Amino acid sequence: MAGMKTSPSQDEEACVLAIQLATSTVLPMILKSAIELDILNTISKAGPGNYLSPSDLASKLLMSNPHAPIMLERILRVLATYKVLGCKPSELSDGEVEWLYCWTPVCKFLSNNEDGASIAPLLLVHQDQVPMKSWYHLTDAILDGGTAFNKAYGMNIFDYASQDPQFNKVFNRSMAGHSTITMKKILETYNGFEGLKSIVDVGGGSGATLNMIISKYPTIKGINFDLPHVVGDSPIHPGVEHVGGDMFASVPKGDAIFLKWIFHSWSDEDCLRILKNCYEALADNKKVIVAEFIIPEVPGGSDDATKSVVHLDAVMLAYVPGGKERTEKEFEALATSAGFKSFRKVCCAFNTWIMEFSK
């Protein structure tokens, strides 16, 4: 553009980044294949510090395609570039160099842990053909109004999932894996459940989150609150009572009310309705415990935590009418508007922030 002067080195760097952005679909699709081929789990099982060659990997994965090692090498190179894998050279007997690949901390979270949980299903759901189609409608949604997913399917993502058993399975698996990993970290980091006699998990689904809380704090009575058809199919958990209802109508009473990743699916008006019902369900000096992502006040941050949350905000923009990630000030404003006397940001667990709204 006229008037914009850059040095040759700045131009070089900027153009290289532009090309990387232009081909940025490569990384998620390579990761999708790596997960579907069980590459990451196989490398993780080898253990930290143990390296595998592409040929080793093809053999362990029982691949019959004679070209598989060469193709795997190209996939592994991409993953190593983004620190999903580590790599080192190994000199062969003929003097040629072969590259070997190993586990990294990022690979740890994209592989099954001791609980069988992983972030991998979260990646698979976002690369699934169903939600991918919605991105082709984002431009129209911005120009004409509405939500990209609704334009693609005529309904929101939650209603669609209830009508598509295969996608529903993929969706639920992604939520379960992410939730298990995050809740485990929350329970290691946050001590605000100590001393509670009862806790209500609003929008608690099958009760898995509440079961994790009660397993650590067995004297707490847990109330898992969700829509009747959701809790009707939920498994029995010791110390957990399933209660069906509508959070927009009322919320069961408890010492504390827990809401994890609920508010980012709703508009400010809907969040306020939910919070006012929570306020009515609490005695004085009791609290709502909120677990949500917090988006920075100032745009332009380049750290991984910021990139992660702005990605999730874009996901909510495309998939969920009214859904969005919020700043700390926006959460505090919601708490104040609902009548709570204090707001406190307590701690962070894998980019999910714990906040307390006290009555």
Curated annotation (Swiss-Prot):
Reactions this protein catalyses: bergaptol + S-adenosyl-L-methionine = bergapten + S-adenosyl-L-homocysteine
Phenotype upon changing S265I: Increased catalytic activity
Effect on the protein of changing S265P: Abolished catalytic activity
Entry's transmembrane regions: none
Effect of L122F: Slightly reduced catalytic activity
Chief location of this protein within or outside the cell: cytoplasm
Top-level EC class as recorded in UniProt: transferase
One GO cellular component term noted in the UniProt record for this chain: cytoplasm
Positions bound to bergaptol: H126, H264
Location(s) in or outside the cell: Cytoplasm
Active site: H264 (proton acceptor)
EC number: 2.1.1.69
SUPFAM superfamilies (alphabetical): S-adenosyl-L-methionine-dependent methyltransferases, Winged helix' DNA-binding domain
Variant or mutagenesis effect after changing S265N: Slightly increased catalytic activity. Slightly increased catalytic activity
Induction and repression of expression: Induced by methyl jasmonate (MeJA).
Effect of I157H: Reduced catalytic activity
Result of altering D226A: Altered substrate binding
Superkingdom of the source species: Eukaryota
Known partners and oligomeric status: Homodimer.
Functional note: O-methyltransferase involved in the biosynthesis of furocoumarins natural products such as bergapten, a photosensitizer used for medical purpose such as treating psoriasis and vitiligo or facilitating resistance to microbial infection and other stresses. Catalyzes specifically the methylation of bergaptol. Not active on xanthotol, isoscopoletin, scopoletin and esculetin.
Protein name: Bergaptol O-methyltransferase
Originating organism: Kitagawia praeruptora (Peucedanum praeruptorum)
Gene: BMT
